[in-house]
């Protein structure tokens, strides 16, 4: 019987597998098995300078010289290390988790990858990192499932042999993307160098295939709004008693839109009330909208006032409890098994979110919402149905309530009948060029549960139209060219969805990433996304580049799909970066001249520097870099020369008390939060010796032996200077008394010992 070591991605998945298979160890469908789990990625790529040979380290650690770019893919060894985390405790944790998995390996015949089956292939990559680090050379299998118990159990019937990782499309896709993203790091360095050369000081530039598209999109829309000039016009239109509007078809070059009202009023005199002729009436139906991706869930829940980061974290927590389905899915459809899984739960879900069960009469899956097979299926409520929204509120807060309500209603809507409306078209009898078309609701059906109009940028709607009246009268319509809408979440995510860039989860996650932290590229003010100083500089520098182009990003995404389907060598993804950098670097240089011309940037303040200036040089035969400053002291050229020569230097530095002290020290390799670095190391013994000598020479301190111990104390207390006689009494343990003067000028006596 084959003995399997099954690797899960995370503890929650491990617990679900235990339930599905009957325990942490055992037999299942003819296999012996042992379960273990990771905590996501345990490994990471080393820094660029650590991935190349010794003689090339200087080039790949350089942040100042543009001649070192673009990087050469062939120079990289692509080695990984256990993740370091933020501190030594983090590093120890990752080591402990890896060791626990490795200890279970002996005695097994095969390793099984049972991580998330995600669109990016990330689950396969993190599993292979562990497998390779353990030195495993045997068979490797893959289980594909959606984390439900039936799906896990079925996956053993279709286990895939992926022992040759170079034929594992998901692994290759994720590897190619990971290498691509590390190499695009050089664009961030390039942009920062050029910005600093132009005397602009962003504390970061975060250039990447999706981040750059989002930043450019916000920049272009904001710029269009800033440059908008209102151009009023006046146009003759007709309106019937029901409020329906009749107008002529507008095309460039027509003359019926007037720039002044007088001309429109003159035209109005030539027209009169006209009977309406109805051309056509027809009943039409509209199917429920597609199930929302996570980006669209973000739009819906964001309208309740919740931020992207909170939405993502809360949805993930609810998924871990199997209340909602897998967040990072790439489809908006489900298969028959996934639909059948939820059918018995429909009425219970409806009760939780307050939907009338009598509306849920369409119990067959429409073709629009159906796919032959989906690993995870669209975002939807899942098999752990809460008793009430209050139960969710207690566990996940108001954000959880909003998520469940929106996701559940969107799913329940596909169980409703089609929206039915009557489409009417009409024209004016006396002026047939004036036409109108209206849709009159007849049966709302699914729209009573979920209205997809909420996903649009603007959700304001006019009153529902009613049937045409018998006649219509002319009036002058005051119009203007449309001002571009604000760049809100719906605008950004809908644009990316139309361009088919990323999954819904990736789009929402990236939008959250660029708007977080002290080095954010974007900030959100009352639902509107605006660029920070960092983002504005990046947008200006990257205008017209390949990395900020939606078209290029789409091509890269297509390339990743080709790699996944084994139709393209994964190395073509990272090697394409050299071409992108060669194209973009001169454009970024050229765009630097536009920094001073940007009115918004001129009003912004540069953030405080995140990183200190670095010095690079040869130290003990090794190319290193270290901070050019220590405390408030900036090293001189001579001091830098001596430090690199391994000599001790001495300089005056200000202490916390405002006094200056002689400080001595040398360069040394040190460790901070688990990470090694080179920097100035203080000679603490010399400083302590100086302070003691200074204290001994201080005329305002007394040095003596008191109760058998050598001590010192200040000779001045509250403005009173102890006399020699008083000092002798204090040393002998006697009380002394002396006069003091208060702030009000009165005299009082102080006694003490």
How should each PLM-predicted stretch be described?
Residues 93, 99, 106-107, 152-240, ...:
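C-terminal or mid-to-C-terminal helical accessory/interaction module adjacent to the motor/catalytic core
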Residues 9-12, 38-40, 110, 116-122, ...:
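An acidic- and aromatic-residue-enriched active-site/binding cleft used to recognize and process polar
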Residues 2-3, 24, 109, 165-166, ...:
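Basic, low-complexity terminal or inter-domain segments flanking catalytic cores
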Residues 19, 34, 41-90, 103, ...:
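Long, highly charged, low-complexity internal segments
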């Amino acid at each position: 019987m084959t003995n399997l070591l099954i690797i899960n991605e995370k503890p929650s998945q491990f617990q679900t597998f235990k339930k599905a298979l009957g325990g942490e160890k055992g037999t299942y469908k003819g296999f012996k098995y042992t379960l273990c789990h990771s905590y996501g990625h345990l490994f990471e790529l080393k820094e660029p300078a650590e991935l190349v040979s010794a003689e090339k380290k200087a080039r790949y650690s350089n942040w100042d010289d543009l001649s070192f770019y673009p990087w050469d893919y062939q120079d990289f060894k692509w080695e990984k290390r256990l993740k370091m985390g933020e501190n030594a405790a983090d590093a120890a944790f990752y080591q402990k988790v890896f060791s626990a998995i490795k200890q279970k390996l002996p005695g097994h015949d095969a390793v099984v990858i049972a991580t998330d089956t995600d669109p990016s292939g990330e689950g396969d990559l993190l599993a292979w990192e562990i497998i390779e680090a353990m030195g495993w050379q045997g068979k490797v299998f893959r289980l594909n499932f959606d984390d439900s118990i039936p799906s896990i159990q079925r996956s053993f019937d279709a286990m895939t042999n992926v022992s040759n990782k170079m034929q594992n499309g998901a692994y290759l896709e994720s590897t190619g993307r990971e290498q691509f993203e590390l190499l695009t790091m050089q664009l961030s360095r390039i942009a920062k160098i050029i910005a600093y050369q132009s005397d602009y000081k962003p504390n970061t530039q975060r250039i990447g295939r999706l981040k750059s598209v989002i930043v450019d999109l916000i920049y272009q829309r904001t710029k269009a709004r800033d440059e908008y000039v209102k151009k009023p016009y006046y146009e003759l239109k007709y309106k019937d008693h029901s409020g329906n509007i009749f107008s002529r078809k507008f095309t460039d070059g027509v003359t019926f839109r007037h720039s002044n009202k007088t001309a429109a009023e003159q035209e109005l005199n030539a027209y009169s009330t006209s009977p309406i002729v109805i051309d056509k009436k027809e009943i039409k139906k509209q199917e429920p909208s597609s199930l929302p991706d996570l980006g669209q869930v973000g739009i819906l829940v964001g309208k309740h006032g919740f931020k992207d980061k909170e939405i993502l974290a809360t949805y993930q927590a609810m998924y871990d409890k199997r209340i909602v389905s897998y967040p990072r899915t790439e489809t908006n459809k489900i298969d028959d098994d996934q639909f059948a899984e939820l059918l018995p739960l429909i009425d219970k879900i409806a009760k939780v979110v307050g939907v009338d069960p009598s509306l849920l009469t369409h119990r067959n899956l429409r073709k629009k919402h159906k796919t032959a097979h989906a690993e995870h299926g669209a975002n939807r409520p899942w098999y752990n149905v809460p008793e009430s929204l209050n139960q969710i509120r207690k566990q996940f807060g108001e954000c959880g309530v909003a998520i469940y309500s929106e996701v559940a209603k969107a799913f329940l809507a596909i169980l409703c009948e089609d929206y039915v409306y009557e489409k009417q078209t009409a024209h004016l009898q006396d002026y047939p060029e004036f036409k109108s078309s209206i849709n009159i609701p007849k049966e709302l059906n699914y729209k009573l549960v979920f209205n997809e109009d909420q996903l649009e940028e603007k959700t304001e709607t006019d009153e529902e139209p009613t049937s045409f009246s018998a006649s219509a009268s002319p009036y002058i319509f005051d119009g203007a060219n449309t001002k571009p809408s604000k760049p809100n979440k719906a605008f950004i995510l809908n644009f990316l969805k139309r361009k088919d860039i990323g999954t819904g989860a990736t789009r929402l996650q990236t939008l959250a990433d660029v708007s977080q932290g002290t080095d954010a590229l974007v900030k959100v003010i009352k639902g509107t996304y605006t660029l920070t100083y960092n983002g504005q500089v990046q947008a200006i520098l990257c205008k017209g580049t390949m990395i900020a182009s939606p078209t290029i990003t789409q091509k890269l995404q297509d390339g990743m799909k080709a790699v996944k389907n084994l139709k393209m060598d994964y190395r073509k993804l990272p090697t394409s970066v050299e071409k992108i950098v060669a194209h973009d670097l001169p454009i970024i240089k050229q765009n630097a001249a536009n920094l001073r011309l940007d009115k918004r940037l001129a009003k912004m303040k540069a953030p405080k520097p995140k990183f200190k200036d670095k010095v690079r040089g040869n130290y003990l035969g090794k190319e290193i870099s270290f901070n050019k400053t220590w405390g408030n002291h900036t090293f001189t050229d001579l001091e830098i020369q001596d430090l690199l020569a391994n000599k001790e230097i001495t300089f005056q530095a200000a202490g916390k008390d405002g006094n200056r002290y002689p400080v001595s020290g040398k360069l040394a390799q040190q460790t901070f939060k688990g990470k090694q670095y080179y920097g100035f190391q203080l000679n603490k013994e010399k400083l302590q010796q100086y302070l003691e000598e200074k204290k001994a020479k201080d005329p305002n301190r007394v040095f003596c032996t008191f109760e058998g111990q050598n001590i010192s104390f200040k000779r001045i207390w509250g403005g009173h200077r102890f006399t020699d006689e008083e000092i002798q009494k204090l040393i002998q343990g006697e009380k002394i008394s002396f006069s003091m003067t208060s702030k009000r000028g009165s005299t009082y006596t102080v006694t003490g010992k």
